A protein has these predicted regions:
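An acidic/histidine-cluster motif and surrounding catalytic segment
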Residues: 1-77, 81-208
Length: 208
């Protein structure tokens, strides 16, 4: 409800996708998950939680929807995202200045290495082009709160999506694995809600 009011107030069209509740997934889906991959390769203290599995599937379903309907690009916002009042202008200016071959733009992200030159965009923000780490690096661009993905980017993520074995932000953030051409807005212009968990993870929080 809060994000709907915010986006409507900014004059942005949007569509809600039903989140996948990991606790309600059928046994056939849960049995197909590779629970060992994440802790083995990325030093997680525990295997994927049901909340993380549901979250990953929710994002993957959007990529599949894009491919099935030939949607050229989409901005994906998690339900607890807090969007800057300048978000619309930031997106428009970014798309006017970015390389046409871009595939992924993060509006929220953790630390990440980028190429030296950054383009200035509205309201003092900068557009950075991110460097892919070495192929076997564990480094990842964390957070899948808000990002733009193109059709070609969605196809690349789907090539690495199955079996389910990573949280949503590891699938988007492991650009050394997916080879997605990735950019980001610096500093972030969308933030994670601090007082409420995402609808798909109310009971089982990732870091608890």
């Amino acid at each position: 409800e809060n994000i709907a009011k915010r986006l409507s107030g900014l004059g942005l069209d949007f569509t809600f996708f039903d989140a996948t509740d990991g606790k309600k997934l059928p046994a056939s889906v849960l049995e197909s998950v590779d629970y060992d991959f994440y802790p083995k390769h990325y030093l997680s203290p525990k295997p994927l939680t049901l909340g993380e599995i549901g979250c990953a599937i929710s994002h993957i379903k959007v990529y599949e929807h894009m491919v099935e309907n030939n949607i050229k690009s989409a901005i994906i916002l998690e339900d607890d995202a807090i969007v800057s009042q300048h978000f619309k202008e930031i997106v428009e200016d970014t798309l006017n200045k970015i390389n046409k071959n871009h595939e992924l733009i993060f509006f929220d992200h953790g630390k990440v290495k980028s190429y030296f030159f950054k383009k200035r965009i509205v309201e003092g923000y900068r557009l950075a082009h991110y460097k892919a780490p070495s192929k076997n690096s564990r480094r990842c661009i964390i957070y899948a709160t808000a990002y733009l993905i193109t059709l070609s980017g969605a196809k690349k993520l789907l090539n690495y999506a199955y079996p389910i074995r990573l949280p949503a932000d590891y699938l988007t953030g492991l650009i050394q694995k997916t080879r997605v051409d990735t950019y980001g807005i610096e500093p972030p212009c969308v933030f994670r809600g601090l007082n409420s968990d995402s609808e798909i993870d109310k009971i089982e929080h990732r870091y608890e």
